[in-house]
């Protein structure tokens, strides 16, 4: 009886829905019956909107599923559901409210609702105290905006939504404002809304009185695109087999020439895939897209000075201000005295504060302002009463600050710091050497003669610029090396023809011919030729090459290598005791942001005390798994096998058994040979 009831169409909505989708005109009467039933349920719901109604929820989902089949009857249905939600969303039953939202999402996926009005309604629903609903709406909003901008940027919809979000960020409801901010941040990270307007709307959240909103906005601006790119690269590299997987597969399989060839082929394919260049993402960091960074930084500093938030939030504010000042080269002179208050060795997170001081330094800041900052670091950190680690951190911070603002360093302070080159602590000694090495390239004249080292081409060409002076060149420095190399290549081509003709004659002998790659010798000859040229002639050649030809990436790589070689090669006229040094061309360029490793770099790790070593050893033991194979039985209650019983049996009971007595043992001669082989093997190892 129940089965027959389930097949009746008026009471079985899923079956009716399935049939209507197959043939809408055939079931129009059943649809109209359900539609009238839906209307009467809506009228009842309006009288008591706070009461749950399972029947109405089923009818709303049914209508949403078949709305595309009867557009003439259900043209006003989406607007009706939206009105019910917008008027009663605060008092609605949570399950019924979720059903209404799902029905609207279904209608939007069928493109039966305008996205702007629906998304505005969903943003308003963020005010509801329903975590599951907020999560569902958040996912739909991000996905829908992504689909809207999939083929091309839909600026009409984007502008309307961005303006609406700007008002939502200032909403009195903190939850709604936070969710709206999360949507904007997610859209920026997914490269959907990566324009300046989105970034400048998010800047308003940095002045929110709600801590969660403030922290979310600061975290967004402190995020780095480079890190995200590396993460995405590492995620993509995890897909598919690695070289280790292929080697393990070969080692565990059958050893044959066919399998070996398969392995080599697979390794080649893997290498080729790794070498494939991915499309570059031309995505600036959000800090670059701020319209008025000077005004933004001043407001942030004012907020920081009267901030009553936790210390971690203050650190984030300091970090953002320092990045703004360093990247945009702003004038924010009150920021440096503010940082000086925290520059004490006992200060919490002092290495990060030193990093912020270095980030906020640039060549346009007047040297007098940075000088007071340097003296504070030197007086508080680089003194003999402090430990070696504290002194090292102080010298590293001074080095990073002066690398960005060289004019701030005084000759007296530099000479004092250079004396630590012979300090007993290796970390202090090495950090002082790095500071000396920096000034050998920046301004060797400030160092004492014994610390200047052997003069190189780069140190002779180095020139100290005055405050505010620009060094504008009308040529590419180092471009003169290209023309010389071109001539050398022409000569090498002629030599190449001669060598090939010789090799053809000698090929009949069937002997191997040694081919000598003389790239190192060529580079030495090029550097000799350039050294013999006067400086004026070099500049003229570089200017001629820069204006007469289009330089390729390979040309720029050669120029960069030549400029790096200048720092190694001795100056012309001096006795060249140095050998030619090969330069690593894969060296990563230094970014515009500093890393905490630059400040905390210790060349020698400090010894850990006994308690720390014991704690690490004990932690390792707890995490370690037993290297024993667990005996697993199909039936845990079954008895042990005869084989297991044999292993566990006492030897004295097995001693006189037939199996032991009839066992084949090694003869005396076999034992002699085994001993001899073992002794020979041991002697080889001793050698």
Curated annotation (Swiss-Prot):
Disordered: annotated span: 483-525, 604-669
Compartments, record wording: Nucleus, Nucleolus
Tissue: Highly expressed in testis, kidney, spleen, brain and fetal tissues. Also expressed at lower level in heart, lung, liver, small intestine, ovary, uterus, mammary gland and placenta.
Keyword annotations: Coiled coil, Nucleus, Phosphoprotein, Protein transport, Ribosome biogenesis, Transport
Swiss-Prot/TrEMBL GO biological process terms: protein transport; ribosomal large subunit biogenesis; ribosomal large subunit export from nucleus
Top-level taxon in the UniProt lineage: Eukaryota
Pfam families: SDA1_C, SDA1_dom, SDA1_HEAT
Residues found modified as Phosphothreonine: 552
Residue stretches in coiled coil: 253-315
Phosphoserine PTM positions: 232, 234, 236, 585, 595
Principal localisation: nucleus
InterPro entries cross-referenced by the UniProt entry: ARM-type_fold (IPR016024), Sda1 (IPR027312), SDA1_C (IPR048292), SDA1_MD (IPR007949), SDA1_N (IPR012977)
One cellular component (GO) term of this entry: nucleolus
Biased composition (Acidic residues): 490-512
Purpose of the protein: Required for 60S pre-ribosomal subunits export to the cytoplasm.
Similarity comment: family membership: Belongs to the SDA1 family.
PANTHER family for this protein: HSDA/SDA1-RELATED (PTHR12730), PROTEIN SDA1 HOMOLOG (PTHR12730:SF1)
More details: DAZL and PUM2 bind its 3'-UTR mRNA, suggesting that these proteins may regulate its translation.
Official protein name in the record: Protein SDA1 homolog
Lineage start: Eukaryota, Metazoa, Chordata, Craniata, Vertebrata
């Amino acid at each position: 009886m129940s089965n027959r009831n389930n097949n009746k169409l008026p009471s079985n909505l899923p079956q009716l829905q399935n049939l209507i989708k197959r043939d809408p005109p055939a079931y129009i009467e059943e649809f109209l019956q359900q539609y009238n039933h839906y209307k009467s349920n809506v009228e009842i719901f309006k009288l008591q909107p706070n009461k749950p109604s399972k029947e109405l929820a089923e009818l709303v989902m049914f209508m949403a599923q078949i709305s595309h089949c009867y557009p003439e009857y259900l043209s006003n249905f989406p607007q009706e559901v939206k009105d019910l939600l917008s008027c009663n969303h605060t008092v609605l039953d949570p399950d019924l409210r979720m059903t209404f939202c799902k029905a609207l999402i279904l209608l939007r996926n069928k493109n039966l609702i305008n996205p702007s009005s629906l998304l505005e309604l969903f943003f308003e629903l963020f005010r509801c105290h329903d975590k599951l609903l907020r999560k569902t709406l958040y996912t739909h909003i991000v996905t829908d905006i992504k689909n809207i901008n999939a083929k091309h940027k839909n600026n009409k919809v984007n502008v309307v939504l961005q303006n609406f979000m700007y008002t939502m960020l200032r909403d009195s409801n903190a939850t709604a404002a936070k969710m709206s901010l999360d949507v904007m941040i997610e859209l920026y990270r997914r490269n959907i809304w990566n324009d300046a307007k989105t970034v400048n709307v998010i800047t308003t959240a940095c002045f929110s009185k709600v801590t969660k909103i403030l922290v979310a906005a600061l975290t967004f601006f402190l995020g780095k695109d480079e890190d995200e790119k590396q993460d995405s690269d590492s995620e993509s590299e995890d897909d598919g087999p690695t070289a280790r997987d292929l080697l393990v597969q070969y080692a565990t399989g059958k050893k044959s020439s066919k399998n070996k060839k398969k392995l080599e082929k697979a390794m080649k394919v893997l290498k080729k895939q790794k070498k494939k260049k991915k499309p570059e993402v031309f995505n600036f960091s959000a800090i670059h897209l701020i319209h008025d960074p000077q005004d933004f930084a001043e407001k942030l500093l004012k907020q920081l000075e009267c901030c009553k938030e936790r210390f971690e939030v203050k650190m984030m504010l300091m970090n953002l201000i320092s990045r703004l000042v360093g990247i945009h080269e702003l004038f924010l002179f009150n920021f440096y005295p503010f940082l000086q208050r925290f520059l004490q060795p006992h200060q919490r997170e002092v290495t990060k504060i030193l990093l912020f001081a270095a980030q906020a330094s640039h060549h346009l800041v007047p040297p007098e302002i940075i000088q007071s900052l340097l003296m504070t670091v030197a007086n508080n950190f680089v003194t003999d009463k402090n430990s070696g680690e504290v002194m090292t951190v102080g010298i590293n911070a001074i080095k990073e600050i002066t690398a960005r603002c060289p004019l701030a360093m005084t000759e007296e302070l530099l000479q004092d710091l250079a004396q630590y080159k012979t300090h007993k602590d290796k970390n202090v000694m090495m950090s002082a050497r790095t500071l000396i090495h920096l000034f050998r390239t920046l301004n060797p004249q400030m160092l004492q003669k014994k610390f200047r080292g052997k003069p190189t081409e780069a140190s002779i060409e180095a020139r100290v610029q005055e405050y505010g002076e620009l060094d504008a060149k009308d040529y590419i420095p180092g471009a003169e090396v290209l023309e010389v190399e071109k001539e050398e290549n022409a000569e090498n081509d002629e030599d190449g023809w001669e060598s090939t003709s010789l090799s053809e004659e000698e090929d009949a002998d069937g002997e191997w011919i040694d081919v000598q790659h003389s790239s190192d010798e060529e580079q030495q000859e090029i550097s000799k030729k350039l050294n013999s040229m006067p400086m004026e002639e070099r500049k003229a050649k570089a200017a001629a090459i820069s204006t007469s030809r289009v330089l390729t990436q390979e040309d720029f790589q050669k120029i960069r290598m030549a400029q790096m070689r200048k720092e190694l090669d001795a100056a012309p006229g001096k006795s060249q005791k140095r050998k030619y040094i090969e330069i690593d061309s894969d060296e990563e360029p230094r970014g515009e942001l500093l890393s905490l490793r630059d400040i905390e770099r210790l060349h020698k790790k400090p010894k850990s005390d006994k308690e720390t070593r014991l704690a690490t050893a004990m932690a390792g033991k707890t995490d370690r798994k037993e290297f024993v194979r667990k005996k697993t039985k199909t039936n845990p209650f079954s008895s042990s096998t005869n084989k297991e019983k044999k292993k566990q049996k006492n030897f004295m009971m097995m001693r006189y058994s037939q199996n032991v007595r009839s066992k084949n043992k090694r003869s005396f001669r076999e034992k002699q040979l085994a001993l001899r082989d073992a002794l020979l093997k041991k002697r080889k190892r001793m050698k």
